[in-house]
Swiss-Prot record:
Lineage top rank: taxon: Eukaryota
Keyword Transmembrane: yes
Recorded name of the encoding gene: tmem141
Name of protein: Transmembrane protein 141
Family stated for the protein in its record: Belongs to the TMEM141 family.
Tagged with keyword 4Fe-4S: no
Cell compartments where the protein resides: Membrane
Keywords for this protein: Membrane, Transmembrane, Transmembrane helix
Length: 124
């Protein structure tokens, strides 16, 4: 048995997915990085607003509101970015290919034969 967080994963599953422990460690790091960015962002923006409050007067509740909302957006973007990197590592460890997120989507090919559907079903 292998511990992943609070749950235990069977050895057969770990053997089937060799990159599982690296992926879980990467995800844990991504979530901790997002949490840290939320806390540090809130504190930094709050004290930055307190310094600006000498110039622009507005109530403390708006300081808290703006700090929390902007830090939430920042934290979400950091966590999302790190999670995408973890997903890329997982796909690389599972398939051996590096996923290309910048490739253009190919349009589906239209067949010249109108008697077959896109699922290769023949119409009579």
């Amino acid at each position: 048995m292998v511990n992943i967080g609070l749950s235990k994963v069977d050895d057969a599953i770990v053997a089937k997915h060799p990159g599982l422990q690296q992926y879980v460690a990467c995800q844990s790091y991504a979530f901790m990085k997002g949490t840290a960015s939320f806390i540090l962002g809130t504190v930094g923006i709050f004290f930055g607003q307190r310094a600006l409050q000498k110039i622009i007067k507005y109530p403390l509740q708006w300081n808290l509101f703006v700090s929390i909302v902007s830090s939430s957006v920042f934290s979400y973007s950091v966590t999302r970015w790190e999670t995408m990197k973890c997903s890329d590592v997982w796909l690389f460890l599972e398939t051996g290919n590096i996923p290309d997120r910048n490739s253009d989507k190919e349009e589906p090919e239209t067949s010249a034969d109108s008697t077959t559907t896109q699922h290769e079903d023949v119409l009579e």
